[in-house]
UniProtKB/Swiss-Prot annotation:
Disruption phenotype: Leads to starvation-independent sexual development; the effect is suppressed by cAMP. The keyword Nuclease does not apply. The gene is git5. It is found in: Cell membrane; Cytoplasm; Nucleus. It is a peripheral membrane protein. GO terms for biological process: adenylate cyclase-activating glucose-activated G protein-coupled receptor signaling pathway; G protein-coupled receptor signaling pathway; negative regulation of induction of conjugation with cellular fusion; negative regulation of transcription by RNA polymerase II; sporulation resulting in formation of a cellular spore. WD repeats lie at residues 19-49, 61-91, 104-133, 145-176, 188-218, 231-260, 272-302. GO terms for cellular component: cytoplasm; cytosol; heterotrimeric G-protein complex; nucleus. It comes from Schizosaccharomyces pombe (strain 972 / ATCC 24843) (Fission yeast). InterPro entries: G-protein_beta_WD-40_rep, Gprotein_B, Guanine_nucleotide-bd_bsu, WD40/YVTN_repeat-like_dom_sf, WD40_repeat_CS, WD40_repeat_dom_sf, WD40_rpt. Belongs to the WD repeat G protein beta family. This is Guanine nucleotide-binding protein subunit beta. Keywords: Cell membrane, Cytoplasm, Membrane, Nucleus, Repeat, Sporulation, Transducer, WD repeat. G proteins are composed of 3 units, alpha, beta and gamma. Binding of the beta-gamma subunit complex (git5-git11) to the alpha subunit (gpa2) facilitates interaction with GPCR git3.
Amino acid sequence: MDSGSRVNVNIQGTRVLKNKLGKIPDIDISTDGKYLLSASTNDVLLVWDLHTSNKVAFFEAPSVWIMTCAFSPSTKSIAAGGLNNFCVVYDTSVPDADPVELVGHAGFVSCCKYVDDGHLLTGSGDKTCMFWDIEQAKAISVLKGHEMDIVSLDFLPSNPNLFVTGGCDKLAKLWDLRAAYCCATFPGNTSDINSISFFPSNADFVTGAEDGIARCFDIRASAEIFQYSSPSSSPINSVLFSKSGKLLFIAKDKTCEVWDSISSKTITSLTGHENRISSLALTSDGTMLATGSWDECVRLWSSSG
């Protein structure tokens, strides 16, 4: 999305995908950049073709308000979780087949990400993460350490055994799946963490919080390295780095700020949504950003820079 060392980045809205099936709490883009997955609060999952903007698959999830969704690395399956405390996994090639149900959490499932095609990680309002064998529909391990709801998680791009979580206890934590334990805790946030995301090429991660502050931490130094503060103190709903890591996308209210992490300046604000932006997703080549919103739309943005 960014253009080398230039500060002026030309990001343009290209298309709008209209859901009309309820608020969109989460979106994901397939690894190959061909498809977008959107979840709606009316318990519907839609798969969109990003080339044609057409809906290509429709799944009804047995939930009471979906909160999270994810593509598998191969796009052969999708996962979703919500207020019914479990996660469902669908085979995308057989839309009418019964989903695999991953049951075990004692609270809502707020976030999920695939480790690989056969394994999934979920975070929950029961303060735990669970690492699942999808084929067996069984939890391999339960990771405990947060004092309140877990809201967001992300994997270290260079090592999927390591991941970070953020939650309502204002803490970010680093975990190792191999030993199923917490490696480090990162204090510093002064309100609930709504979103957490790794820098694409190293061991830094960013948190977006309810108080409108985004903080970037280095897991090697166990220290905060920079901070963004919203002028309006509006809650940050989602954060995501550009492919190079130079830009930080920050979703708050109805806008997405594009912030230069080197100069510590806002380059532009992406507008057009009529309700809060809840989720951000980026194609693996970094050329397309998607914003999902409670206005029942997904907006697509691209840059020629």
